[in-house]
A protein has these predicted regions:
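Anionic-ligand-binding alpha/beta catalytic cores of soluble enzymes and soluble regulatory domains
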Residues: 292
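Conserved beta-alpha junction segments in alpha/beta enzyme cores
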Residues: 1-276, 280-287, 300, 304-461
């Protein structure tokens, strides 16, 4: 699915948006989760098995068309730490018949990257078994084990399939409105140059038949409300923001992540409902989400989005030079699509570009993008770790002649790790690193992404 074959510069005649929505639980019963399934987040030497379930985990889906005859675009948002491209492709394949019947031009599967969700990436399994036993299994053609649970993944993919079918089957015509709220007080950026999208971005769909509204909301705040090493299953702050939106506006909700690479939650009396100094992490996470929900509900300054949706995807190869990730891959900790050729070892992934209306665009990124790559402000010369300049224009600058404002859809269709400007890629042990380089494919990831994005923009014109 490459997206819309043709990019339109203006809405088609008599164009109107149509949107369908669905949400459903992906959690299996508690007995099958607690003490049996691993939790995402930071890698642990101890078995990081779930000890409790605080919140439900869901898949939420929006199916959108601009009635131009170029098909339906589907956005799937999953409460998960990460999904690799092979799993995303299985989800797409499960609805191949529907895609052909309904002319679905793209299915974008993203995650909210909760560090407290069931491990769907694989890196949080029994580290000793993965490091010591899996290599031997690979050598002799055996089945490796990691943090993923086969039954859970099968159910997750089934629920994604059902959700896509339901969203496509419930599409109705209406209008789309765009508004923002300031999110700068809610986030902490832990790494220079401290660039971010300062807004919660809300896309509010109002059906013409008076049925329930659907809100698509982006945020750049990491879902680490209960810490990265916890064992309690939670949906983090989006779960509680959604509850407030349900109660206040009665709307359907789908959150997705922007460029949230090194951000964290700034929790204090201004950003947490009923704040107390002695709050537990879970209490503070809930109050943080409730405050965000109220902020999103308070948006009043909106503009109508013209009924135009252009989508384009491109296959890309990203070189792997991080020796730790190479070893982790051999140990079965990750299930990325790896390609070897005469030039080295690569991850095969996808990169996307979306135009929404006449004023907005999205870079669709298969990992965690440094915001400065999207919006500008990369460190230059002596201010960078290498002392060298960064010579690529930002993604926003690449589309400047379109007059569109760029936003980011992060962790979409794959999880290739952190994407850091080449000239500011530093040793993993450096204090300023914040461990980003530990889970990055390597020093050339950003320049590869930027070059491919520039090519994608050119192909779209």
């Amino acid at each position: 699915m490459k997206g819309t074959e043709e990019f339109l510069s203006a809405p088609a005649e008599n164009a109107v948006f149509s949107l369908g929505y669905d949400a459903r639980s992906i959690l299996t019963d508690a007995d099958s989760v607690i003490g049996k399934m691993y939790v995402g987040g930071s890698i642990s030497l101890k078995k990081k098995l779930a000890t409790a379930i605080e919140d439900d985990l869901k898949v939420r889906t929006a199916a959108v068309s601009d009635s131009s005859g170029r098909g339906i675009s589907v956005l799937v948002s999953v409460d998960a730490y990460g999904l690799s491209l092979p799993d995303v492709r299985e989800i797409r394949q499960s609805v191949a018949g529907l895609a052909k019947e309904k002319n679905i031009n793209s299915i974008t599967v993203t995650v909210l990257h909760q560090h407290s969700a069931v491990d769907t990436l694989g890196m949080n399994g029994n580290i000793f078994e993965m490091a010591l036993v899996n290599p031997a299994k690979v050598l002799f053609g055996g089945q490796t084990n990691n943090g993923k649970n086969d039954a859970y993944m099968e159910n997750l993919k089934l629920k994604c399939k059902e959700s896509i079918e339901a969203a496509v089957g419930s599409m109705t015509a209406g209008k789309l409105y765009y508004g923002t709220a300031d999110q700068s007080a809610y986030l902490i950026d832990k790494r220079a140059p401290y660039v971010s999208d300062s807004s919660f971005n809300r896309f509010r769909f109002v059906p013409s038949d008076g049925s329930k509204e659907t809100w698509l909301v982006s945020t750049e705040i990491h879902c680490v409300g209960n810490g990265a090493a916890g064992t309690v299953i939670t949906g983090d702050y989006p779960y509680y923001a959604e509850q407030v939106i349900h109660e206040t506006a009665g709307a359907n909700v789908l959150f997705f992540m922007g460029a949230q690479q090194s951000t964290s939650q700034n929790r204090n009396e201004a950003t947490v409902e009923n704040y107390r100094e002695d709050m537990t992490r879970l209490e503070a996470m809930k109050g943080f989400g409730e405050s965000i929900g109220k902020s999103v509900c308070a948006i009043t300054d909106e503009t109508e989005v013209a009924p135009l949706l252009n989508v384009r995807y491109k296959k890309i190869l990203l070189p792997i030079s991080n020796p730790i990730l190479l070893l982790a891959g051999k140990a079965g900790m990750f299930e990325s699509l790896v390609v070897k050729n005469k030039d080295g070892v690569f991850v095969s992934s996808e990169l996307g570009y979306i135009e929404l209306g006449t004023d907005l665009a999205f870079a669709v990124i298969p990992g965690e993008l440094a915001p400065e790559l999207a919006y500008g402000g990369c460190l230059q010369g002596d201010a960078s770790w290498s002392g060298e300049d960064w010579n690529y224009p930002s993604m926003q600058e690449m589309i400047a002649d379109s007059g569109r404002t760029l936003r980011v859809l992060d962790l979409a269709n794959d999880q290739v790790g952190y994407i850091i400007p080449d000239n500011n890629f530093m040793p993993m042990i450096a204090e300023e690193s914040n461990s980003l380089e530990l889970v990055s494919l390597g020093k050339k990831t950003a320049s590869c992404i930027m070059g491919e994005f520039a090519a994608l923009i050119e192909e779209s014109r």
